[in-house]
């Protein structure tokens, strides 16, 4: 909704209707990455956010493709996209914080979000484990969710007895 409403307001009337959800003067947290997360970072920057932090659940990817990630798989490597680069120029640092799990949202007396509680996590044997003593509270007046998806919902596959692979996607034979 954030990106859509801002683009619509800009294109319809140059923000004259004040209908867009603005990051101006706010501590912004973007939960999740990818293209949508980068767009949320860039839009928040252009609106004059006070700060921007981007939470990533997984660890920072390696600089080069690992042997366990061969071609033709999508290369899982560290990338700096336009939003990260712009944020670095404005705030002097990359906005991404890795291996963070959001535990709860904090609200102010009026019921608006005012912060987030997190804990660091590590991936062990395919399972995310919380790291004791790493709890942290972050200021946030605007939280944007950009978590995407890893696999389809499974109620269809369960009802139709469709097998799923190790990533939770429907199993299929190539070419069928």
Feature roles, as predicted:
Residues 37-38:
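N-terminal Rossmann-fold NAD(P) dinucleotide-binding loop
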Residues 16-18, 85-95, 99-141:
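A structured beta-alpha segment of the ubiquitous adenosine-cofactor-binding alpha/beta core
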Residues 41-100, 104:
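Rossmann-like dinucleotide-binding cores of NAD(P)H-dependent redox enzymes
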């Amino acid at each position: 909704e954030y990106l859509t409403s801002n683009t619509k307001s800009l294109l319809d009337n140059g923000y004259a209707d004040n209908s867009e959800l603005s990051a101006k003067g706010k501590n912004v947290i973007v939960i999740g990455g990818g293209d949508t997360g980068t767009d949320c970072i860039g839009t928040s920057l252009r609106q004059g956010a006070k700060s921007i932090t981007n939470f990533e659940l997984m660890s920072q990817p390696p600089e080069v493709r690992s042997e366990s990630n061969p071609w033709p798989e999508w290369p899982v490597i560290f990338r700096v996209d336009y939003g990260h680069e712009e944020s670095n120029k404005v705030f002097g640092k990359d906005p991404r914080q890795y291996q963070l799990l959001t535990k709860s949202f904090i609200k102010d007396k009026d019921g608006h979000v005012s912060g987030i509680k997190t804990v660091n996590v590590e991936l062990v044997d395919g399972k995310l484990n919380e790291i004791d003593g790493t709890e942290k509270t972050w200021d946030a007046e605007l939280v944007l969710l950009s978590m995407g998806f890893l696999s389809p919902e499974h109620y269809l596959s369960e009802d139709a007895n469709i097998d799923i692979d190790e990533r939770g996607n429907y199993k299929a034979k190539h070419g069928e």
